[in-house]
Curated annotation (Swiss-Prot):
Protein name per its UniProtKB record: Receptor-type tyrosine-protein phosphatase C
Modified residues (Phosphotyrosine): 672
Transmembrane segments: 567-588
Domain notes from UniProt: The first PTPase domain interacts with SKAP1.
Subcellular location: Cell membrane; Membrane raft; Synapse
Ranges of Acidic residues composition bias in the record: 988-1001
Residue numbers of Phosphothreonine PTMs: 1267
Gene3D superfamilies in the cross-refs: Immunoglobulins, Protein tyrosine phosphatase superfamily
Chief location of this protein within or outside the cell: membrane
InterPro entries, sorted: FN3_dom, FN3_sf, Ig-like_fold, Prot-tyrosine_phosphatase-like, Protein-Tyr_Phosphatase, PTP_cat, PTP_recept_N, Ptprc
Domain Fibronectin type-III: 376-472, 473-568
The family this protein is said to belong to: Belongs to the protein-tyrosine phosphatase family. Receptor class 1/6 subfamily.
Positions annotated with a glycan in the UniProt record: 66, 152, 163, 209, 213, 220, 255, 260, 292, 313, 324, 349, 418, 429, 459, 491
Length: 1293
């Protein structure tokens, strides 16, 4: 029996061996249903999270082995080998006590192994240590099939995976891991007999619940793993303490063989090293605009290697709980590391927990308190009270805060408008506001809103109310005029008042004589006819306006009736007869004198004829390379050499007869009796009806430079010769007329207006019909497009361009020869090879006409041959028309224009060519040489100390200068009068301005300010320094005396601790001597502040309004930070300036605009240059940066003194007028303007000024040669190269 039982047991044992169930170290091949998959590593977590269970995961798995005990995973225990998780939705099962559990199934490694007991709780940790149960958080935002960092081992021993917890310490982060217990797999074979042969604990069971601590060393960014609660643990053949060191973050160490003396056999575990916690930092990403209803937190990583640390394993969660414990959980799926909560309450405290999960386990947790921003206040309800004529009271109840806003409004914005809107910012402690300065009898709309100032200003909804002001006294009538239609009747007319201030319109006329009432009229229009008055009587007419409620002040005019005409008839008849006789006698005497004078001239010409050629000098032509030196040599000693040359040229060459012009029937066609054309080259017109005099006109053919009869020099047409003039234009086929005079100069008639006006359209001159098609006014000239047709010819009309130069002064010559070079460019643009001669005329047709022709011809010679013979050409001109180039100053002007052109060339650029031209000018070829733009800048004269500065450097005036290097020149400084003359509103204007003008004004006071020519000559600008505290009164006095309309302020009041401009305005009224200044309004834009001032003088009746534009985006840098804002401000302030007058005195002492910065140099100069360039671009479609800057440098020291500023002017114009398809597109001034500086570091030139102190030696030595000036200049100007501008080359765009 015993033997039989033993044999049965032995057979059963072999059967077990045959099924490979009991072989140590072997694992049966898993079935498809139980195939192992990647497992999610569970990272440290301070709070337990709910576990996931799936339909494919049973709650527990039984094993066959020693005792066949059943083991269930507890919280904190995670098996290495997991079944494939179903993608179906998870169910969350919270564990008791708030700890979440998750159950996994695994194929058994060895059926004889006994699982370790429970381990479902976290081991106790050291202070600051957080032990995290190895469970997947119950957040559906994270998929259950998260990729794992560990796989099951195919080795003989079972594979185990660690669970992780973290501890923050000063030297690094300690991470603790619990290993899961070994799992068994239930056999599919029916159990027969369980044999327990184990005498020693298995290593799989011992290491199943092992705790692994990860200690982070921030110094080398590695981890050290420590197997807790196991003594003498062996990893392979070495102690685990020596092996598990210097582990890289996010690394995977698989199949580590671990064993111990008290267990067998050895097993393997996998380690999943987490990332370092110091790689994460929490930041607030809430937009200010949404800060009242949103919270946004963003985790940022630093030096985290995502090639090792898969970003898919890192998740971010944000929990925010308000005071009412409502829990809000959001996750931004588009930006995983950013979490944002919306639709929150304003001004509410939230406690937010921001977490990072590594493979679904908390790695980092931050708890912060966040308060949302203030909410939008409630809309106040305004009430418009009973208005008066010019004010009303607006009141409103104090608004109650909305539930989501915990604070009251911080202020209110009240706006009211009739045609234009004005707004006032009010504090939050007011509930009413009196709106003043309203217009009577007008409809107004008031809007009111409340606002709070949180992170940004939040405005509530505006509520409106309306009111209508009451009537008030009307203004006086305008333009009252009186006239006498008959000897004893008076017509009285007037215009309506500026403001009627009432519902109706009545005009009242009261007539008085000798203080007694005569009569009274009432009418609805201001046209009164008063008759039946006494003859030769003085009357007083009073006209007032009545608006139905009030009557305005009366306007008074005095008028007298005439004598009775019938009583004077006999006397007048007698007087007419006597006057006629006397007039006939005078005319006969004049005729007789002219006849005698003509015969005397013929005799004189015959006497000097043989001496004409002998008095000429031998003057050599001048080569271009010595043109400047030759000019300086001849202009020296008050132009002695020029005078000698000019006086050697005969005024009239007597060998050429002048008989036709002296014929009796032609004498009335000559404007001047001594300026007549030679017979041999006069222009002959076609004869009309056998009239011999019809062929004559005072005009001569003039040869150009190697081009015969290129010009016709003519006198300015008289009223009697206008028809002949147009006949000459038609017959000579001329297409260009150059007029170098104004019709009237100095109250003298210089030329008849021989063209139709734009209003007239067409005018006939006998058979010639002239039609005007276009009229364009520019500062220095007027261009008119005319069509000329002949009534008797079938040919179509011809296009004729008429160019009138308007900047030639009444006396002398133009100050700047560049003006004539500019005129020449315009003329040559309209002339062509196939057209007839260019007709040039002034008044007499010799002085200015000869000067222009001489400049044009000599420039052609300079360009063709590189040399000029001015003397020889002027002699040639005199041989073709007497007195050509009439005075010495005109002869010198020709040389000056040639020097200007030879030194500086053509610098004007059309807007259509600006972009391509600027692109080429910035190129360097070769790269070591300056670009053409740099070379152009270097050619700019410095003009430093070119005129005297005596007044500003006087001892008593030095303290009035902010910068000793920026002192106005005497010739154009702005003088201040001590006392205003009551009889005149402005000071007398002189025809010229010289250095001595200011010096001789003993009654004038000094202020650091200079007159600067604006684009629209003769209008001026004033460039000034920022006022000092002791000169504020003088500053306002200058504004009043010079009738300034706009002040441009380009500086702050202080720069750091240094005052750069005194605050010359204040609240309320400020008094400065006889001046009273009151700030009426302030409006702030994004780039500037607009203030409105009212100026009153004790000796003047009417106040003046002055506007101040303070640029707030130019903080003292060399260039403005936002150029587009500066352009926008210029466009706005131009609306405040008066219209430019087409005519006026050249040297005009009023300025509509005053510009100042700290010392009136760099920012002021750049602004003035930009202002003039924008006007030129808008008017003429051309810009000339070089000439604009040169003109400003002559007017004030220190302007546009660096290459960067010079290039800025080109760039900003190019940005405002971008090219599109080859055409210039005028863009909105608000478009963004960007600049690319072509030079790394430009050097300032000799014209630059430092904040204070004298010029150094290098600056003194940078002086050069000056621009030519007229001989009456006391000092010569300088021409200075602007230093060596050779910065490192940059890549051209």
């Amino acid at each position: 029996m015993t033997m039989g039982l033993w044999l049965k047991l032995l057979a059963f044992g072999f059967a077990l061996l045959d099924t490979e169930v009991f072989v140590t170290g072997q694992t049966p091949t898993p079935s498809d249903e139980l195939s192992t998959t990647e497992n999610a590593l569970l990272l440290p977590q301070s709070d337990p999270l709910p576990a996931r269970t799936t339909e494919s995961t049973p709650p527990s798995i039984s094993e066959r082995g020693n005792g066949s005990s059943e083991t269930t995973y507890h919280p904190g225990v995670l098996s290495t080998l997991l079944p494939h998780l179903s993608p179906q939705p998870d169910s969350q099962t919270p564990s008791a006590g708030g700890a979440d559990t998750q159950t996994f199934s695994s194929q058994a490694d060895n059926p004889t192994l006994t699982p370790a007991p429970g381990g479902g709780t976290d081991p106790p940790g050291v202070p600051g240590e957080r032990t995290v149960p190895g469970t997947i958080p119950a957040d559906t935002a994270f998929p259950v099939d998260t990729p794992s960092l560990a796989r099951n081992s195919s080795a003989a021993s079972p594979t185990h995976t660690s669970n992780v917890s973290t501890t923050d310490i000063s030297s690094g982060a300690s991470l603790t891991t619990l290993t899961p217990s070994t799992l068994g797999l239930a056999s599919t074979d029916p159990p027969s007999t369980t044999i327990a042969t184990t005498t020693k604990q298995t290593c799989a069971a011992m290491f199943g619940n092992i705790t692994v601590n990860y200690t982070y060393e921030s110094s080398n960014q590695t981890f050290k793993a420590d197997l807790k609660d196991v003594q003498n643990a062996k990893c392979g053949n070495e102690d685990c303490e020596n092996v598990l060191n210097n582990l890289e973050e996010c690394s995977q160490i698989k199949n580590i063989s671990v064993s111990n003396d008290s267990c067998a056999p050895a097993t393997t575990i996998d380690l999943y090293v987490p990332p370092g916690t110091d790689k994460f930092s929490l930041h607030d990403c809430t937009p200010k605009e949404k800060a009242n209803t949103s919270i946004c937190l963003e985790w940022k990583t630093k030096n985290l290697d995502f090639r090792k640390c898969n970003s898919d394993n890192i998740s971010y969660v944000l929990h925010c709980e308000p005071e009412n414990n409502t829990k809000c959980i959001r996750r931004n799926t588009f930006i995983p590391e950013r979490c944002q909560l919306d639709n929150l309450r304003a001004q509410t405290n939230y406690t937010c927990v921001a977490e990072i999960l590594y493979r679904g386990v908390k790695l980092v947790k931050n708890v912060i308190n966040v308060q949302t921003d203030l909410g939008i206040p409630e809309t106040p309800k305004p009430s418009c009270g009973d208005p008066a004529a010019r004010k009303t009271l607006v009141s409103w109840p104090e608004p109650v805060s909305k539930p989501e806003s915990a604070s009251k409004p911080h202020g209110y914005v009240l706006c009211y408008k009739n045609n234009s809107e004005k707004c006032k910012s009010l504090p939050n402690n007011v509930t009413s506001f009196e709106v003043e300065s309203l217009k009577p009898y007008k409809y107004y709309e008031v809007s009111l809103l409340a606002y709070v100032n949180g992170k940004i200003q939040r405005n509530g909804t505006a509520e409106k109310c309306n009111f209508h002001t009451k009537a008030d006294r009307p203004d006086k009538v305008n333009g009252m005029k009186t006239s006498r239609p008959t000897d004893n009747s008076i017509n009285v007319t007037c215009g309506p008042p500026y403001e009627t201030n009432g519902p109706k319109t009545f005009y009242i006329l009261v007539v008085r004589s000798g203080g007694s009432f005569v009569t009274k009229y009432n009418k609805t229009n201001c046209q009164f006819y008063v008759d039946n008055l006494y003859y030769s009587t003085d009357y007083e007419f009073l006209v007032s306006f009545h608006n139905g409620v009030y009557e305005g002040d009366s306007v008074i005019r005095n008028e007298s009736t005439n004598f009775n005409a019938k009583a004077l008839i006999i006397f007048l008849v007698f007087l007419i007869i006597v006057t006629s006789i006397a007039l006939l006698v005078v005319l006969y005497k004049i005729y007789d004198l002219r006849k005698k004078r003509s015969s005397n001239l013929d005799e004189q010409q015959e006497l000097v004829e043989r001496d004409d050629e002998k008095q000429l000098m031998d003057v050599e032509p001048i080569h271009s390379d010595i043109l400047l030196e030759t000019y300086k040599r001849k202009i020296a000693d008050e132009g002695r050499l020029f005078l000698a040359e000019f006086q050697s040229i005969p005024r009239v060459f007597s060998k050429f007869p002048i008989k036709d012009a002296r014929k009796p029937h032609n004498q009335n066609k000559n404007r001047y009796v001594d300026i007549l054309p030679y017979d041999y080259n006069r222009v002959e017109l076609s004869e009309i009806n056998g009239d011999a005099g019809s062929t004559y006109i005072n005009a001569s053919y003039i040869d150009g430079f190697k081009e015969p009869r290129k010009y016709i020099a003519a006198q300015g047409p008289r009223d009697e010769t206008v028809d002949d003039f147009w006949r000459m234009i038609w017959e000579q086929k001329a297409t260009v007329i150059v007029m170098v005079t104004r019709c009237e100069e100095g109250n003298r008639n210089k030329c008849a207006e021989y063209w139709p006006s734009m209003e007239e359209g067409t005018r006939a001159f006998k058979d010639i019909v002239v039609t005007i098609n276009d009229h364009k006014r520019c500062p220095d000239y007027i261009i008119q497009k005319l069509n000329v047709a002949h009534k008797k010819e079938k040919a179509t009309g011809r296009e004729v361009t008429h160019i009138q130069f308007t900047s030639w002064p009444d006396h002398g010559v133009p100050e700047d020869p560049h003006l004539l070079l500019k005129l020449r460019r315009r003329v040559n643009a309209f002339s062509n090879f196939f057209s007839g001669p260019i007709v040039v005329h002034c008044s007499a047709g010799v002085g200015r006409t000869g000067t222009y022709i001489g400049i044009d011809a000599m420039l052609e010679g300079l360009e063709a041959e590189g040399k000029v013979d001015v003397y020889g050409y002027v002699v040639k001109l005199r041989r073709q028309r007497c007195l050509m180039v009439q005075v010495e100053a005109q002869y010198i002007l020709i040389h000056q224009a040639l020097v200007e052109y030879n030194q500086f060339g053509e610098t004007e650029v059309n807007l259509s060519e600006l972009h391509s031209c600027l692109h080429n000018m910035k190129k360097r070829d070769p790269p070591s040489d300056p670009s053409p733009l740099e070379a152009e800048y270097q050619r700019l004269p410095s003009y430093r100390s070119w005129r005297t500065q005596h007044i500003g450097n006087q001892e008593e005036n030095k303290k009035k200068n902010r910068n000793s290097n920026v002192v106005p020149y005497d010739f154009n400084r702005v003088p201040l009068k001590h006392e205003l003359e009551m009889s005149k509103e402005s000071e007398p204007e002189s025809d010229e301005s010289s250095d001595d003008d200011s010096d001789s004004e003993e009654t004038s006071k000094y202020i650091n300010a200079s007159f600067v020519m604006s684009y629209w000559k003769p209008e001026m600008m004033i460039a000034a320094q920022g006022p000092l505290k002791e000169t504020i009164g003088d500053f306002w006095q200058m504004i009043f005396q010079r009738k300034v309309k706009v002040i441009v302020m380009l500086t702050e009041l202080v720069n750091g601790d240094q005052e750069v401009c005194a605050q010359y305005w204040g609240e309320g009224k400020q008094t400065y001597g006889d001046m009273e200044v009151e700030m009426k309004d302030t409006n702030r834009a994004s780039a500037y502040t607009l203030r409105t001032f009212e100026l009153r003088h004790s000796k003047r009746k009417e106040p003046r309004t002055v506007y101040q534009y303070q640029c707030t985006t130019w903080k003292g840098e060399e260039l403005p930070a936002e150029p587009k804002d500066l352009v926008s401000m210029i466009q706005d302030l131009k609306q405040k300036l008066p219209k430019a007058s087409p005519e006026g005195m050249k040297y005009h002492k009023h300025a509509s605009i005053l510009v100042h910065c700290r010392d009136g140099s760099q920012q002021t100069g750049l602004f003035c240059a930009l202002f003039n360039l924008l006007e030129s671009a808008e008017t003429e479609d051309v810009v000339d940066v070089f000439q604009v800057v040169k003109s400003l440098r002559k007017a004030r020291p220190g302007v546009v003194c660096s290459y960067e500023q010079y290039q800025f002017l080109y760039d900003i114009i190019a940005s405002i007028y971008p090219a599109q398809n080859g055409q210039v597109k005028k863009t909105n001034s608000q478009d963004k303007i960007e600049f690319h500086n072509e030079v790394d570091g430009g050097k300032q030139d000799a014209n630059c000024v430092r904040p204070d102190g004298p010029l150094n030696k290098a600056q003194e030595d940078s002086r050069g040669v000056g621009t030519p000036e007229p001989t009456n200049s006391a000092e010569e100007p300088e021409h200075a190269a602007n230093g060596s501008a050779s910065p490192a080359p940059t890549q051209s765009s």
